[in-house]
Amino acid sequence: MAEDRGTRLWQFPDHVYLNFTAMHGIQHVVDRISSLAEESVTPAERPPLSWFEAVARADSPDEVPPRELPFRVYLITGNAGSGKSTCIQALTEMLNCVTTGSTRVAALNVFTKLSSAYTSPAIQTIFHDFGFKGSHVQAVLGKFKYPKQPDPKSLVDAQMSDLYYYWDVLKDIANKVVEGGLPETMRVLLSLELKSGKPFTDAAPFLSAATPALIRSNVVLIDEAGVLGKHILTAVVFSWWLHNALWQTRRYAEGKVPVIVCIGSPTQTDAMESVFEHSTLRHLVSNKTNILSHLIRSSEMAERMNLNRNWTIFINNKRCTEQDFGNVLKAFEFGLPMNEGHARFLDQFVVSESYIKDPSKLPGWTRLFASHDDVKVYMSRLHANLRARRSDKFKVFVLPIYTVVSLEAFDKYKELTGQTSLTMEKWLTANASRLGNYSQSRDLDVTTPRFEYGTADGKKFALITTDASHVLNSQISVTKRVKKLVFGFEGSFGDFAAVLSEDTFFKKHGEDHVEFAYRFIAALLFSGMIAFYDFLRTEGLPQDKVDAAYSRLQAVTADLLAATHEQLGIAAAAGAQTGSGARRSRNADAFAFDDDASEEVTDAELDDLFGAMTDNSMDAFYLNYEKLPADAHGQEIFFHFDMLKRLFSERYDALSGLFGKTFTSAPFRTFVGQASFNGSNAFVSSFSGGILSFTSQTDAYTLRGVTRAPVPCFVDELFRGRDWAAAILRETDMPRVVVSDSMGFVSVINHNMSTFVDNVSGEELQMAATVDHGISSNLAMTITRSQGLGLDRVAICFATSQLKLNTAYVAMSRVTSCRYLRMNVNPLRTHYEDTRRVSAHILAALRCKDVKLVY
């Protein structure tokens, strides 16, 4: 329905179909962002490339003439679980936009949402897309101060103030972009565009891998923008104009302005900034105004960005559906007055702090703590408790962490900081949290470090070893996207049947080369067929049903192999006529004995062989099937997969009909090679036939142990570009972690490697390289880390000092049901700090007729 009595009610773009239930709420957001993306500025207002070249040449921001970098902004805010992620999915489907996340976890959450509906490219962080590099992590922020008091009504002053603050990073980005120049591919496209008048430059992202993401569109989506300082907004706008000016894009020529779509909750998050003070070896952590609060609370900025028309608020917590609990969360989110009714409702969840910190209580619950130190203390207590219980299933074992420190760089560091008496032990204690590439390294229960000193290739080094405790069969997360090799499956027959009936595995692992995914599952099916016969040897099964099961298994196997052999025989004959029968003939031989070979078999061997074949308890499948050849490809792989899948399904139906849940819930284990587990040690004969993939920081894994079996595809990969530490780290011979994912697939994970480069007085020092396993426990975590997660059971231990209401809101809103919430205190009955200053502006927006609301 496009028209009704002359009034347009709906518009549906031809290029997309949306869920009708989502269309009404999202359509106006799409319309408004599309309208903003069409706005343009005059050539005089458009920042020229020469201005960015001046930034690249300048030694300080004082040398750069002030100018405005035009942009537009659109806000999408709402309480936890209100549907903001669904909105991102709709916008990505309907608009040509650059979709990003503020953090790696936020980006992965967006990717998970998008890839659940269709094939999605990887989603990067906004830092990655605007040009932030690892070398910028140690940049000194705020080294330059804007020389005058910024006029709140002046966008130029606001942006130049951010430029001064973020100078080292933005200057380096500009310098690298300008030095790199315009690629030859783009020069050719520009030439073609000038000659033909057709938009050839729009094809640049598809022709050059080095094409910056920000030239693809002038609409940039940032999820979880509430954790970013306001200077990042200027950095994104700066980078968009820089890249588009250099690449001479059509949007730049037309004066189109970037539209930054900021998504998140300003009441949940803080923008934190950490600065390391070398003179005192201390971390200085401070709160910064985040992007969302900056735009909402600054009346001048809100007016300049016409925020009333460019803001949508999502309401209602769809994650937690209990009405009373939802009302309390709304009061936290929107700054409503907290009354005695709210406090009484939360009283029911309060238990003693000692109860929450007792590892023997609330098994399987996730503990949330205020600090990394609290997490570490709890994990140490948990490990001690498990060691005392001597549990075989939840056994505590240790994994090594190695750090190599360059003594030459360490001596230089002492010289530059004026700390000539600084010891390696003191330096390590102060920098432990900076050496790794993830904050959860501070949560680990580790031993006292051990120091070894040596020389390699003429360079002196210190090798520091610590052991981190982990719990076998516990839930963990990975802290970085690293390679994994999937080599098996552990679960139940029902679990594997569900994998075969769905396409989740093939969507996740078969986007680039679906043949690999089919070959891998075919290998698991081949190895796992014997499991049906193993199940029938389970003690306590009714003998009459066991006998019937053997007969049915033999019948379905014989029928399917006969039908398959006949089909392949026909195909082989047809192939012989067309000259392509060699491979088909080999396929036909895969399901029958070789007649020529039978002449070499003795009578005694034939008696044994045929005697076995008449025994129903022997699996005739393995006597009549040859494993898929290594050089098979294309249709041949799919044919074998399809045949094995049908055989598994028919066997599954036969046994589930006889034994019901006893069978479907029975263990099913299969691997591409031989694999066995003894405590925390996994013994694997071969990884050949496994499928290569990547871990995800948003996925939960079960820790199955470690293996020292060589993984050929991982060899030396981590040591590329780290020549000074490579020889030392190779000698450590670290084991690799084995995990299983939520679907039951078992993988071996590559090591996590990080290089620590420190910046002292403008000089970069290659200080250290650390290799560990990059995993952290899901049994306990900080409240900050839990943000964005939906957890089943949560026990919160708030800090005893003054509690911030936004911290309490983040922690409590993690649960999917308030029945599984416990807290050491009621936040409303403590001396809390009301950090919801932005809420008054949100309440005013709710009353504004121009601000859009989505329920």
Swiss-Prot record:
It comes from the Viruses. One of its GO terms (cellular component) is host cell nucleus. Keywords: ATP-binding, DNA replication, Helicase, Host nucleus, Hydrolase, Nucleotide-binding. GO terms for biological process: DNA replication. Its main location: host cell. InterPro entries: DNA_helicase_dom, HSV_HELI, P-loop_NTPase. Its EC number is 3.6.4.-. It is an enzyme of class 3 (hydrolase). GO terms for molecular function: ATP binding; helicase activity; hydrolase activity. Associates with the primase and the primase-associated factor to form the helicase-primase complex. Belongs to the herpesviridae helicase family. Component of the helicase/primase complex. Unwinds the DNA at the replication forks and generates single-stranded DNA for both leading and lagging strand synthesis. The primase synthesizes short RNA primers on the lagging strand that the polymerase elongates using dNTPs. Possesses helicase-like motifs and therefore may act as the helicase subunit of the complex. This is DNA replication helicase. It comes from Psittacid herpesvirus 1 (isolate Amazon parrot/-/97-0001/1997) (PsHV-1). The gene is HELI.
